[in-house]
Amino acid sequence: DDCTTYCYGVHCCPPAFKCAASGCVRNN
């Protein structure tokens, strides 16, 4: 897959995003 970040070991963020408390957020 094209996931680069995993939130809490479960939730997968796309490459341009990062994991934050509220979920995946766009990585500037």
UniProtKB/Swiss-Prot annotation:
Its main location: secreted. Keywords: Disulfide bond, Knottin, Neurotoxin, Secreted, Toxin. Expressed by the venom duct. The keyword Disulfide bond applies. It is found in: Secreted. GO terms for molecular function: toxin activity. GO terms for cellular component: extracellular region. Disulfide bonds join 3-13, 7-19, 12-24. The keyword DNA-binding does not apply. It comes from the Eukaryota. The presence of a 'disulfide through disulfide knot' structurally defines this protein as a knottin. The cysteine framework is VI/VII (C-C-CC-C-C). This is Conotoxin Cl6a. The lineage of its organism: Eukaryota, Metazoa, Spiralia, Lophotrochozoa, Mollusca.
